[in-house]
Amino acid sequence: MARRRLTKRQRERIAQVQEERRDRLARQALNASEGEEVHQGRVISRHGQHLLVQAVNGQQYHCLFRQNLGEIVCGDKVLWQPVADDQGVVVSLLPRNTVLSRPDYSGRDKPLAANITRLVVVLAPRPPPTGYLTDQYLIAAELIGVNALITLNKADLLSPDEWQAFQQEFSRYENIGYPVISVSAKKEHGLEPLLEHLKGQTSILVGQSGVGKSSLINAILPHRDEAVGALSETSGLGRHTTSVATLHFLDNGAEIIDSPGVRSFRLGKIDRRELETGFREFSPYLGKCRFSNCRHRNEPGCALIEAVEAGNIHPERLKNFLHMAEQLD
């Protein structure tokens, strides 16, 4: 059944009511006393100057925040004061354990999500994955200090032999300590390996368009639409809530941040030393080259090249590193 379209007058009235509500909350926020009791909470979502904050007891509050707090994002831990039954004001941003950022249109890093512990890299047979892009995701995980999980999706698209060959392509990542799992949203129990790895973690899914991230999110969060609808009703943000980052809680203790912006994540601006650090298996060889200014291309006595020749570093990983290093020069 088609949704009834609102008249211009009705839309204007709704906008007016929402504006009056925002103004009222803003006045209450400004009048909040510094001496009043504060509570700790978690940012479930943000849209503009509006936050949905979940208190320790699980109740959610619609909050504004003070301008001097900087950029607050989904997953942040905050201190807030109540100003009404279901409304409050955030007065302090607590220190972050981790923050995932990506460059904005001006090239500056823009925080997307905070306090994550796991980056789930989703790959699929189609579109064909590239080691170059996969390595960018893994570098991001290394630099912000979170665990990475490589998830091979859409197992149902290939025969058992083809799938085994596809899995074999990623054995080089298992050899350097990255867990690799296979999942399918269409198979019975096809999500169990992923759910097991998500337990006790705050995770974000990243990957190319078309690898099935949305299908996995919808399968993991079957009541996602209901949660987004409740957020829309609570926040007064209407349809805009479908495109904002949202923190979801699973029954097994897992937390997932669902965000279109995060899912299309790309690596931000880094320097050469950070790039080297992002390749974890390079660590034993850094600083061991014959020349201190070694570029790891064809210099004699290059420790990385010798490690490749000895089978300790996969040649494609060094190739991808050199390609990325060119972008920095």
Task: Locate the predicted segments by residue.
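N-terminal accessory targeting/assembly segments
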Residues: M1-G131
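Helix-rich effector regions associated with P-loop NTPase G domains
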Residues: A2-K8, E37, C74-D86, L94-R118, ...
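Conserved beta-strand/loop subsegment of P-loop NTPase cores
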Residues: I116-L123, I144-D156, E174-V183
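Catalytic P-loop NTPase motifs of RecA-like helicase/translocase cores
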Residues: P129, L158-S159, H189, R263-R266
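Histidine-anchored nucleotide/phosphate-binding helix
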Residues: L133-N147
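Canonical P-loop GTPase G-domain recognition
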Residues: L157-V211
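Walker A/P-loop
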Residues: S209, S214-S215, A219
